[in-house]
Structures are given as C-alpha cells and as structure tokens.
C-alpha cells in the first residue's frame, strides 16, 4: 500500500514546524522538518569556515542524519546531536543562503525522498510540494502576514537575553522572504495544486485543525 505524503510549504516564521508536528500527532504520521537539514548543513559550513566555492566538495564529509527518538525528530552531525545549535538567528540566516546552493539541495534531495517513500509523512519546507514531493497526496501552503510572523517570533524570544527588537525581527523576516522567493534554485512559491492556509488570525490549534480538515477531505475523496 502506498504511503501517504503531505507537503507543507510556506515562508519563514509561518509556524510550519510547530503546526506540522501537531498535525502529525493527530494523524499518526512521521513529521519531517526539512529545514533542520539545511540548518545543519549551514552549521557545518559555518563551524568549518568553508567558502562557497568549496562547499560541494565538502558535503560528503558532513554526515548529516535524521533520527526519530521517542517519536521526536533529532538532527545529527556525525554522532553529535545539534538539534538545539541550529536554531540561532545566525544559523537561520546562513541556512537561507546555503539552501540556495544547488549542490546542497541535490545532496539533501535524496534523503528527503527516501524518508517519504518509506513512511506516511508530513514534510515541511520551502519547496516540498513543488520540487521534493511534486506528487504529494496533499499540498498545503501555510502563511501569515510578515507583521504577525514577526510578532510571534518576538514573543518567543522576549524572555531571552539579547532579544532582538520587533523591528529587527520584522526586517529579518522580510529579507528572508525576498531571498527565498528570488533565489535561482527552487524559489519559494505556492504549488498550483496546493491549498492556501493563512494563519494570521488563527491560533496554533485552529491552524492545525484547518490543515487536518483539508487532509481528511482530500484523502477521503481519493479513497
């Protein structure tokens, strides 16, 4: 029996990872955070001071892997769990640049497709429905206004030391949106057959339920 693949794409800060995890828990599917893979490559490149022209040759030594521990995705560089290290603003910006490099996308492409072929998955990223899983059973484009995304991120970081200002976060989101939408390789865009879910005025539970309804409607009709 064919495994069910759900693709969730959208801009930075739209809540893709959090909402996709909630949806996967409701449906019993494996959640795959592809952004974590790109962030890990960015961390590897940053830690080793690898210039762009040498990245392709260095990729086979990166040894990036996903492991599912107690139902939770963890990402590793070799035997080192770097799941926490890849969530800094610096690595976020580095990942936006790194993910535009064709060699990096090609390196991770096979990993993502293999996981999807072997499991019922909910996979989120920037080009899942358009490039990685073009034949996904259901495609969602999850978005929210830049201002709302910045506000959510600011609330997340407010209690942490050296928290950036709301305006700095908003500027960063606008910059990342531009980079992601205008890169030459696999730019961020909504797949023609994707369902748009705008969460600007929805909380997390409402967003997850909206997506579950779309999935159940589409999978039910297909069956």
For each feature predicted by the language model, list its residue ranges.
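N-terminal phosphate/diphosphate-binding loop that engages ATP/GTP or pyrophosphate donors
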Residues: 25-89
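Conserved lysine of the Walker
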Residues: 16
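Small-molecule kinase domains that catalyze NTP-dependent phosphoryl transfer to phosphate-bearing small molecules
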Residues: 67-69, 112-118, 126, 131, ...
